[in-house]
């Protein structure tokens, strides 16, 4: 059975890149465009892992992460921030919100897949 990954990303091009990459290694992909949609999708589908953009149109990925991690069923689900935020301290904000890992855009596809596989080992 393939692992389910929820991609919370508002930019269509970025969602397509992530979807194609993840599908190429047989992960099932669920997509969400906003923080609210992402939280709802996480609760409905209980994915094995979440890729979280930080800059979202309604509330940011930090808030979405906090809401997801507040649900006891979803607390153990790993969340990897995949974001263009690369200033000093941005990674700390993500970790404080509950993200388990932090990857900056543009990312290396091989490095991102390696990071994902760490959680499925």
Stretches found by the model and what they are:
Residues 107-116:
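C-terminal output helix
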Residues 31-49, 92:
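Acidic, metal-coordinating helix/loop segments flanking the phosphotransfer/catalytic sites
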Residues 57, 75, 87, 105-106:
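The feature encodes the CheY-like receiver
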Residues 53, 83:
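Active-site residues of response regulator receiver
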Residues 32-33, 45, 56-59, 68, ...:
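Hydrophobic residue at a beta-alpha junction
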Residues 9:
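Conserved acidic carboxylate
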Residues 12-30:
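Two-component/phosphorelay signaling modules centered on CheY-like receiver
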């Amino acid at each position: 059975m393939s692992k389910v990954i929820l991609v919370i990303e508002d930019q269509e091009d970025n969602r397509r890149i992530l979807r194609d990459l993840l599908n190429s290694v047989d992960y099932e992909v669920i997509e969400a465009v906003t923080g609210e949609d992402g939280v709802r999708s996480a609760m409905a589908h209980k994915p094995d892992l979440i890729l979280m953009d930080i800059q979202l149109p309604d509330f940011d990925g930090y808030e979405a992460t906090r809401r997801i991690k507040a649900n006891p069923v979803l607390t153990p689900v790993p969340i990897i921030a995949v974001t263009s935020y690369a200033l000093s301290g941005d990674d700390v904000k993500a970790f404080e919100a509950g993200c388990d890992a932090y990857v900056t855009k543009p990312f290396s596809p091989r490095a991102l897949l390696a990071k994902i596989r760490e959680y499925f080992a």
